[in-house]
Amino acid sequence: MDLNYKLRGFPKVHFFNLDNRKDRRNWMVEQFECFDIEYERISGTKYLASESSKWKHLIKDIDDYKLLVPIAANAISHLDFLKTWYKESTDPYVVLMEDDYDLRLVDYWTFDWHTIIERLPYDWDCLLMGFENPDGIRFHLHPIEPAHDFGPVLLKRSFVEKILDLHCVGDKYKLVNTVANAAWNRQADVAGSGTVDYFMVHTGRTYCLPLITVNANFGSFENNSIIQKFYRSEGDILARNTYYYYWQHECDRYSLDEFFSYGTSKHNDMILKPRKFRTYDMTGKSYKLYGESYLDYFRKS
């Protein structure tokens, strides 16, 4: 295990970024260079939500598609990239990221990338390396849960082939499919098979590890909209705070065997409720000032 260079062997990252979001692009590039990660920027401008008239004909089942236009644009952008990657590359894996992830938790990992790959169950299709779940975040390896959504992922080539088979028909995209997962078939405008939050992680054997969180300071879509401001404040900020709390103060309480497994009563103690961490100070200043009594507040609340 090489804790001096934890990301040795980490695959090339393909990250999606709109041309006008230089703030997000610069944020990601600075992190990649800091951690010596090979990367490729994928422009999301080919399928802009504001220019849907140029590409909506590519959705084979457009008459039945009810999700928000930016969600469709994002879905097609990812599928378009995967088609190209699958055709032009022979790599066994591919790593995908959006442009708002916070990689600084790597500094707190107690293992390296080789250990992660070595510990993955042999039947995996997808490794979800970061996720938000308001019902509770499991800080250990586990199969994907119903309310998990898209995050930084490592995909096997065979799984990419399956995704393309399910959602690509010639030059068009089939985005309306039957979904039995109640977390993803209730809200017609934001949930369903036609969002990357579902089809990229819920259509195969996905295992999850809480390794990477979000930078909650960025809005999404083509600008920092008020809708995304509300979403970020109520979702991503809580998740980010919870991730930082675990990696800064809780990870040493559990062994690697416990972190890379699931299914015991011990693992129930490794679930944290994001709503408890609304006021958590990830800078460490409050902990430095109040010591263990500061942590006791979150452990007991």
Residue ranges and their predicted role:
Residues M1-M97, Y101-S301:
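An acidic/histidine-cluster motif and surrounding catalytic segment
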